[in-house]
């Protein structure tokens, strides 16, 4: 920005270190740039029409060079201290070569382009110089990525690319740490999944082993139960066969039928025993309630008609079973069961046996035994009375030899 002062001098306002600096100008401000072929070009500030009238035409080139050198040094002295140490062949101090950005590969055209940004608000220019071997090596060294990001990129598998001795690192500020954390997270997830798989396998193995153990235990218990049940059935079958042998004319095979036959056989045996006891005068030894099963015709029946009663004398008498039974009539409730009546019944039975012609076909009659005791029955007394009568009415044959001498014959 150019401002005219009161002394008809051109004053230029420059931005230097955060402040505005006013500097007088006596010559036309030009920016000279040198190329590799030695040509120079002047670049005006874009305000040529306004400033051309203030510069005289008689100024020589030496004055212009001196003014430009002073102006350039004052502007770039503080911003670029290394510009004063440039080569002596150039008539102005070139700006220092900045390293190219990390994302841009080096130029291959043989001509390096360097530009300076934010030098001043009024002057801007480009300086094209031929590229030398030292400069090319320096550019290649600056373009090479550092060693540490390359190791992290090889560990991560992405993020670096190199070609022809030069490379570029994309996102070198945050990718290594993020990739490392992602790798660690992935490793933790893998380890957790492996541990969970191992735990699942262990639980499945324990469950399968417990199932096998439980199944073995159940099968063993079932085998023991089957064996004990088989033994019990064998014992029952043996007992049933023995019972079947005791029952006459039993040809049943099933257990229920065999038990029914045994019950019926026991009932018939009990009835026969009770009848035999009644016919042989063993009424006091009768079972309670057995008289109701005895038929009336059995009372007073001849013992000779019942062959089974002949051997009852050899049997040992059983004790009296005094068990209470429902609807039982006591044995001594009737007067017929008294001892006197029992003795009379026995004598009557013996008298009928003695007078039975079928039992004594030869006419021989047995003399009934005399019953001794205070209880003398009526028929016994009558029989004793008949004996003297028979002896008195009987005529005995007389023989002389046998007759005793009488008193008449003396």
Curated annotation (Swiss-Prot):
Molecular functions per Gene Ontology: DNA binding; DNA-binding transcription factor activity; protein dimerization activity
Regions that span the bilayer: none
Amino acid composition bias (Polar residues), ranges on this chain: 380-410
Biological processes, Gene Ontology terms: internode patterning; negative regulation of red or far-red light signaling pathway; positive regulation of DNA-templated transcription; regulation of DNA-templated transcription
Matching InterPro entries: bHLH_dom, HLH_DNA-bd_sf, PIF1-like_bHLH, PIF3-like
Localization terms from the record: Nucleus
Biased composition (Basic residues): 209-219
Domain bHLH: 220-269
Amino acid composition bias (Pro residues), ranges on this chain: 93-104
Keyword Nucleus attributed: yes
Tissue specificity field: Highly expressed in the node portions of the stem. Expressed in the leaves and the basal part of shoots.
A Pfam cross-reference name: HLH
Basic and acidic residues bias spans: 187-197
GO cellular component: nucleus
Region (Disordered): 82-110, 137-225, 357-410
Keywords: Activator, DNA-binding, Nucleus, Transcription, Transcription regulation
Assigned protein family: Belongs to the bHLH protein family.
Subunit and interaction comment: Interacts with PRR1. Interacts with LF.
Job of this protein: Transcription factor that may act as negative regulator of phyB-dependent light signal transduction. Transcription activator that acts as a positive regulator of internode elongation. May function via regulation of cell wall-related genes. May play a role in a drought-associated growth-restriction mechanism in response to drought stress.
Protein name: Transcription factor PHYTOCHROME INTERACTING FACTOR-LIKE 13
Organism this protein belongs to: Oryza sativa subsp. japonica
